Amino acid sequence: AGKTTTIRMIMAILFPDRGELRVLGHRQALAAKDRIGYLPEERGVYRKMKVAAFLRFVGRLKNVGEDAIDRRITTWLERVGLADVASKKCEELSKGMQQKIQFIAAVLNEPELLILDEPFSGLDPVNMRLLRDLIDEQHRHGATILFSTHVMAQAEQVCERIVMIHDGRKVLDDSLAAIGQRHASRQLVCEPLDPAVDLAALDALPQVARAEREGVRVRVTLRDDVEPAAGLPLVACAVPCASVELQRATLEDVFVDIVQEGRPA
């Protein structure tokens, strides 16, 4: 799609064929490297180096002061549950552990701009939550987070604003809240009081495109010209239900719709 390529251009690893990029007021990231943290998609630890030595090396590249660097390394290793690996070689760590070490390397200089390319790769659910909390913390402390992922659910959990790229072109750029309002789901989910109820009453409604069983629930898809809020009472009146709710459109739904329609949103 172009996500990682865009990040590499921001970081001056690659250079654009035309146009220009500005990062924190500079045309290249190199001029602002001490203010940027970058977690690449690929593993970037030096396998033969010990963890503390590797982090110290990265900190010095980012001009972290000698009086602060060891303190920050110790604090961060404790925070991610790796206090006992400081003297181990990076190659001795699991994939998930290496990912957490790379995250520490990205935030060691307390960056203003934190660029994360698939940061949850290799992490189990517990460590994914830990890393997500740490990312939120960086944002609360004033950092701008550029988060790249192909997993839409992760973007919904982390981001306030979404940019979607398809075939190298931007097809969506808006706040998560605005996207949710503009791409409202046309699907309702109801739980009939009688699980064996005949769906003919729903199919007969002119506002309904189709009704389908999903276990004890029924998924109702409204026609495109019907407001979702207007569909709720219609469904509830047609079939006695214990509950009826609007199914929220996910970012994955939005992306698929945009790609299938072949237009920017």
Predicted regions and their residues:
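Conserved ABC transporter NBD signature motif
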Residues: 19-32
